[in-house]
A protein has these predicted regions:
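Short, conserved phosphate/pyrophosphate- and ester-handling motifs at nucleotide-, phospho-/glycolipid
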Residues: 178
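A contiguous, well-ordered beta/alpha segment that forms the leading edge of an enzyme domain
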Residues: 2-174, 184
């Protein structure tokens, strides 16, 4: 019985010591954070504005800008030199790792949703006026005519190249790219 009581006291002392270290560590971290400045970075990427506010010892604007630029150079339809824009212009190019990763994810989601999610919607997006062109409410005939070359099953990734069944098929990763860029 005495060993059991001694063991409990020892465990209580260890728990108290651990809790004390945890509290002191938390207080030190919080007090250090209070002394760190806030930074506010703004810019344009993916055809839209971004605002980032963060607390850090140094301004990370250049690093943030560089990472967002990588996403823009791969996935932005608003950047005429991006990988996706060049694919949409039917250039035979090797895609970068980022594009391949996002394309594979989009393909998976398209399959899981039975095509409700589809990265080949660029012609539809443009027809409705959400992309580069200002549109009006399109006719049923216009929509139906685009269906001939839209659909995730009409495009695939073979190694580092995108293969389209129809050269009029255009990709739009906007539904994934902005979130992906935020996560990067």
């Amino acid at each position: 019985m005495k060993n059991d009581t001694t063991g409990r006291r020892r465990l209580s002392k260890l728990s108290l010591a651990f809790l004390s270290v945890l509290i002191i560590g938390t207080v030190l971290i919080v007090s250090k954070q209070r002394n760190m400045p806030y930074h506010h970075n703004r810019g344009m990427v993916f055809g839209t504005m971004y605002n980032i506010i963060y607390q850090n010892e140094k301004d990370l604007h250049a690093e943030i800008e560089a990472e967002l630029k990588k996403v823009d150079n791969s996935l932005s339809t608003f950047n005429s030199n991006s990988v996706i824009s060049r694919i949409n212009s039917n250039e035979r190019i090797a895609v970068d790792e980022m594009f391949a990763e996002v394309f594979t994810l989009a393909e998976k989601i398209s399959g899981e949703t039975g095509g409700a999610f589809d990265i080949t919607v660029a012609p539809m997006v443009n027809l409705w006026g959400f992309g580069f062109k200002n549109g009006i409410t399109p006719s049923k005939h216009s929509i139906d005519s685009l269906r001939a070359f839209t659909g995730y099953e009409k495009v695939r990734l073979e190694g580092k190249r995108v293969v389209k069944k129809d050269s009029r098929t255009m990709l739009d990763c906007s539904a994934i790219a902005k979130g992906y860029g935020t996560d990067v």
